[in-house]
Amino acid sequence: WATSGLDTHPIIIARHTKAKPRANWSAAEDERPLAGTGKRQALALARLLTAWEPSRVLSSPWLRCVQTVAPYVNEYSLTVKEKKSLSEAGAERHPKRTAKTIASLFEKGTPALVCTHRPVLPVVLDAVAEHLLTKKQKEHLPAKDPYLEPGDILVLQVSAYERGGIVSAEVVRPFTD
């Protein structure tokens, strides 16, 4: 360890923070914004993300996801790559594109943050499971709906040596109101 170290990078999967309730929203679903709690959660998430310093940020283009990553992106002058495949509609229509988006993160080798929605998480988690080093590790991934609560993140540490294999996975809840 002293000479080589453990060479990993994080891939962080975030469920957007608390949005205004669907029942109280009459405009387009992709325009539904964060609730007050969600805005506070997004600020807390931005502070927490500094522990991993993701330099690549991908997000669903839907407003609540973009608003979730905005405090972090703005603080560090990063850009958000909006991916339709990470939206609810995109993942429903083209789940293979969603899986490909996630798989590409393992090929890049850079710290990354992905923000998406609860209904997209099963596709995302299936794509993540392809990069586990052992089948036993799957028990450490969220397995039941809602998978992640609003604002939760799944932090994956990915090995540079094991073909993009995941060496650890942890769910972190940055804020509760």
Describe every region a protein language model picked out.
Residues 168-177:
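Short, solvent-exposed aromatic-acidic interface loops
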Residues 11-12, 107-116:
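Generic beta-sheet signal
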Residues 118-120:
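Short glycine-rich anion-binding loops that position phosphate/pyrophosphate groups of nucleotides
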Residues 1-2, 6-95, 99, 103, ...:
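Active-site-proximal alpha-helix that buttresses catalytic centers in soluble enzyme cores
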Residues 111, 156-159:
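Conserved beta strand-loop-helix elements of the APE1-like EEP
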